[in-house]
Amino acid sequence: MNVADFKKLPMLGILRGIELDSVEPLVEVICSNGLKTIEITMNTYGAPELIKKAVSAAKGRLTIGAGTVLSIKDLKEALSAGATFIVSPVLVDDVMKYCLKNKIPVFPGALTPSEIYKAWVSGATMVKVFPAKCFGPEYFKEIKGPFNDIELLACAGVTPENMLEYMACGATAVTFGASVFRKEWLKNKEFGFIGSSIAKYVQNFERGK
């Protein structure tokens, strides 16, 4: 992962619960609607194989990482499959240490000021504030007061409508997941709806620059 490139379009799509035969059409709809960065969560059945297939299908058009990484086992399986960055819902010390030692971008989750600070000084590329929707954009403004140098990734509850507010309040980047990659759309292979939802985020970001 090139972090500087990620910051040019600072949006991360979270894919959870997808099936192997959906990977290729998902990659195509993601690429065609302008999203550049995705994660596939490790608590999805067959996650390493899904990551490997996504990397192959993307042919360099996407930056692909692994999410919900909670152990060294998860981490190594993800990296072997081709993941280039790591995301966790919490700070996992041995995962952090491995990523830092091997210069792998890592986004640990945190919520309270103490957790956010600890994750940052532990070497986080960005700190994933999760679940962001519990406090909203104003929380980011308050956190950035004393911690103005900490880079924050807003996760959970970010919509096309409030995305720019999160960024204005201090989020360096945002995520979206179940609201775009909806279970019913995935089940029915309604990839057009997914593409339209992605496009709303990308277009709103471009308009707000």
Task: Describe the predicted segments one by one.
Residues 95-99, 117-122, 137-142, 162-165, ...:
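Short, charged, surface-exposed secondary-structure boundary motifs
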Residues 16-17, 66-72, 88-91, 108-113, ...:
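Glycine-rich beta-to-alpha transition loops that act as phosphate-gripper elements at the mouths
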Residues 145-207:
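Hydrophobic secondary-structure block in the mid-to-C-terminal portion of proteins
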Residues 10-12, 37-39, 61-65, 84-85, ...:
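Structural preference for beta-strand elements that scaffold enzyme active sites
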Residues 71-81, 114-122, 139, 158-174:
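Catalytic cores of alpha/beta
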Residues 89-134:
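Histidine/lysine/aspartate-rich catalytic loop segments that bind and position anionic ligands
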Residues 85-95, 129-137, 171-190:
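Glycine-rich phosphate-binding active-site loops on the catalytic face of alpha/beta enzymes
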Residues 1-81, 101, 160-161, 188-208:
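Conserved N-terminal beta1-alpha1 strand-loop-helix module at the mouth
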